[in-house]
A protein has these predicted regions:
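C-terminal binding/interaction regions
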Residues: 2-23, 87-143
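Structured beta-strand/loop patches that form or line metal/cofactor-binding pockets in enzymes
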Residues: 17-64
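Alpha-helix boundary/interfacial micro-motifs
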Residues: 38-39, 82, 102, 140
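A generic structural motif
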Residues: 64, 82-83, 131
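Short, thiol/selenol-centered motifs that function as redox-active sites or metal-ligating centers
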Residues: 65-71
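A generic structural signal for alpha-helix starts
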Residues: 68, 84-87
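Alpha-helical support elements that line or immediately flank enzyme active sites
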Residues: 73-85
């Protein structure tokens, strides 16, 4: 019984998300870059973004050294980022923080459902937020 929550946390859907990260290689020449590091687990994410002429996100690249939760969260960020307005990234990051603090529902971002079991695992909250923090930091460099 003690292993059941862990099995739910690391579902096939969550583990499968990490394989999509190869589609978003980090490019140091992207104009908006940032790195985020977790103090609790040592995970590191380097992220780069480029905006199009209308100010929407046109490109994203990442280098992810994180646990399965961090990798899945990064993949979901990348999958929904192209064409998004920067304010949507910031709003989703804030929504995820609020949700993890028990102050709201999972924010409206495509495919976040596999991350839902992480709510019951506070030790994984930092890894889940890491790619979003990197994206917000990168976008703040373009403000």
């Amino acid at each position: 019984m003690g292993l059941q929550p862990k099995a739910k946390l690391y579902s096939p859907a969550l583990l499968g998300l990490a394989t999509g990260l190869a589609q978003y290689p980090f490019d140091p020449d992207l104009p908006l870059t940032a790195e985020a590091r977790s103090r609790s687990c040592g995970s590191v994410i380097a992220l780069g973004l480029a905006l199009d002429e209308s100010g929407r996100i046109a490109r994203i690249g990442m280098r992810v050294s994180a646990c399965a939760i961090g990798q899945a969260s990064a993949a979901l960020l990348a999958q929904g980022t192209i064409g998004a307005e920067p304010s949507r990234i910031a709003a989703t990051a804030a929504g995820l923080s609020a949700w993890l603090a028990g102050e709201g529902d999972l924010p409206p971002w495509p495919g976040l459902e596999p991350l839902a079991p992480a709510l019951a695992h506070p030790g994984r909250h930092g890894a889940l937020l890491l790619p979003w923090k990197a994206a917000v930091a990168a976008l703040s460099h373009g403000a």
